[in-house]
A protein has these predicted regions:
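Conserved short loop/turn motifs at secondary-structure junctions
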Residues: 40-43, 72-80, 102-111, 134, ...
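Residue-level signal for inorganic ion chemistry
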Residues: 29, 58, 89, 120, ...
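A glycine-rich helix N-cap at a beta->alpha junction
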Residues: 85-111, 116-119, 124-127
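Active-site cores that bind ATP or allylic diphosphates and position pyrophosphate for catalysis
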Residues: 71, 75-77, 83, 105, ...
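Long, charged, mostly alpha-helical binding arms that flank functional sites
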Residues: 262-342
Length: 579
């Protein structure tokens, strides 16, 4: 973790029960005073905003208490995993501002896990079951009714050992048999009812190739991997609460009764990040990508970290948002407006102010000398004096926002209308004198006169003018494409709504998504103009288009065709773009 992030972590507000648990362990001298966490993503998709909450906790706890957070890829399902996701996950973690101590993979422990499973078979704690998944599920019982024992539950140890080896040799087809832990089919905890701990998967693994055909299940690999690595605090989300007894049991078994009260990982659960108007299941996000409902994993409408990055969110804003919502032991639906507020607050302090006109109409200053060009000084960021200034050219013909002119304006309209003065930001005070329309009544030109003594910085500029508008010089600007992004979904809770649609219409997830998707989630404007200062702007440069919103350069942008993404609109009521 960088020095900045370590400082930020220590300045965060209390992490409540998790922080208290860690502090209690340290006071009691557990784990030799060590704090070690891990972030264990499965490399089967791109990280989303929900993962950011887990990342901030895993790395933040380690930083706060002088420990280490390792990165471990839970690569136990080769059918869905790929090195593309491994590299993308690492990039996202580092972009978010964190650096792991060691990089591990569950596949690093395949041999140890195999040996552990063999030992369980020898001890009579595991057996090969040749029933199919439907039969096994039917025998599970219910939370109030005990399950039914498998007819293979008491098969000879030697037979289970032989079949287990055949599972891994390639002799057994997928779905024909599994290895189950022998625990308690009458346990009130359904996860104790002889859980499957190994299954056959013949898809080559992205790291181990075809070495293995039998793969451990998540519940069997996770706790043991924590133990092998020396994790002290295993942090996960609330759905794993009922898994914790099984986690503890497998750790007890792998430790073979040694040091049960110390030097072992303990699992703690916290609430997931749920956002309204957001769908975060990787399974559903994959459908969006594969069916081209979005333009890839990094589409700025996606809740993926790479999507937020491309849209122009700063890592600091995401960390601040996560810190603001905190960690609890109950689930809640958070308002997306909180995330937007966090990015506005952060970008306000770091974004460079520039001029851009996204719905242009020409303004002609009729008494300004033809051919004259002035360089006006524009402040880069009024919140940060050290950010300096840049120059913007001013001339007789300017582009202004079409919405900044109204021929018959109401009384409280303070922008450009005949007979009224407005201030051209960083320039002069002008008075509107009229306009010109085409044969269809469309506005094509607006006319005004300027006060030569009212240039910004001159004494004449000090008189009170209620309206200020932005502009760019027609002869000194650059054409640009501007992409205005909005919510991808038109329903507040797309997860629940999708379930309701599927049940009501007996349709698949894709059809339900098509019904929920917001047709106005992307509006592309091609007739826009930006000041020349942006000719060298690069992706991840944070910008504020004055009076419009926060933007950044898209990766599709080229010097010949500039493309800007709206990160978030301004909250000001005079913003020219509807939210």
């Amino acid at each position: 973790m960088t020095e900045m992030n370590a400082t930020e972590a220590t300045e965060k507000k209390s992490l409540n029960f998790i922080e208290q648990a860690v502090e209690n362990d340290l006071k009691e001298g557990k784990n030799g005073g060590k704090v070690q966490t891990r972030f264990p993503p499965e490399p089967n998709g791109y990280l989303h905003i929900g993962h950011a909450k887990a990342i901030c906790l895993d790395f933040g706890i380690a930083a706060r208490y002088g420990g280490v957070c390792n990165l471990r890829f839970d690569d136990t399902n080769p059918t869905k995993e790929d090195m593309e996701y491994v590299e993308a996950i690492k990039e996202d973690i580092q972009w978010l501002g964190f650096q792991w101590g060691n990089e591990y993979y569950a596949s690093d422990y395949f041999q140890q896990l195999w040996d552990f499973a063999v030992n369980l078979i020898k001890e009579g704690k595991a057996y090969i079951d040749e029933q199919n998944s439907e039969q096994i599920a039917a025998q599970k019982g219910t939370p109030t009714q005990p399950g039914t024992e498998s007819p293979y539950r008491n098969r000879p140890v030697e037979e289970s050992l032989e079949l287990f080896n055949k599972m891994n040799s390639g002799e057994i087809e997928e779905g024909k048999m599994v290895l189950r832990a022998k625990i308690d089919m009458a346990s009130p905890n359904m996860h104790f009812r002889d859980p499957i701990i190994y299954r056959v998967v013949k898809t080559p693994h992205h790291r181990t190739g075809e070495t293995w055909k039998a793969y451990p299940m998540y519940d069997f690999a996770h706790g043991q991997s924590d133990y092998f690595e020396g994790v002290t605090h295993s942090l996960c989300t609330l759905e794993f609460v009922p898994h914790r007894p099984l986690y503890d049991l497998f750790v007890d078994w792998v430790k073979e009764g040694k040091d049960l009260d110390d030097n072992r990982p303990h699992q703690y659960e916290f609430n997931k990040l749920n956002l309204n108007y957001t769908l975060m299941s990787k399974r559903n996000l994959l459908i969006l990508v594969k069916e081209h409902l979005v333009n890839g994993w990094d589409d700025p409408r996606m809740p993926t970290l790479c999507g937020f990055r491309r849209r122009g969110y700063s890592p600091e804003s995401i960390r601040k948002f996560v810190d603001k919502i905190g960690y609890t032991t109950y689930d809640a639906l958070n308002d997306f407006a909180l995330l937007e507020s966090a990015v506005r607050e952060d970008l306000n302090s770091r974004a460079t102010r520039v001029s851009a006109v996204i719905n242009p109409v020409k303004l002609i200053i009729t008494n300004y000398p033809e051919g004259q060009v002035e360089e006006m000084e524009a402040i880069n960021n009024p919140e940060d004096p050290s950010a300096g200034t840049h120059t913007i050219e001013f001339s007789r013909e300017l582009w202004i926002e079409r919405d900044d002119f109204m021929e018959d304006a109401p009384k409280k309209y303070f922008r450009m209308t005949p007979g009224q003065e407005v201030r051209l930001k960083s320039g002069y005070i002008v008075k509107c004198t009229g306009c010109k329309k085409d044969d269809n009544g469309n506005m094509v030109e607006v006319y005004c006169e300027y006060d030569p003594d009212s240039k910004t910085g001159m004494p004449g500029s000090n008189r009170k003018i209620k309206g200020t508008i932005h502009w760019v010089s027609c002869a000194h600007c650059l054409p640009a494409e501007v992409r205005l992004y909005d919510r991808l979904w038109k329903v507040e809770n797309p997860r629940d709504e999708m379930a309701a649609i599927r049940e009501a219409k007996n349709c698949d997830a894709l059809e339900a998504m098509k019904e929920m998707i917001n047709p106005d989630s992307l509006n592309i404007l091609t007739n826009c103009y930006v000041e020349k200062y942006l000719a060298d702007a690069k992706p991840l440069d944070y910008l504020q288009f004055q009076r419009i919103g926060y933007f950044n350069v898209d990766k599709d942008s080229t010097p010949e065709h500039l493309v800007f993404n709206r990160t978030v609109s301004l909250k000001d009521t005079w913003s020219k773009i509807n939210k």
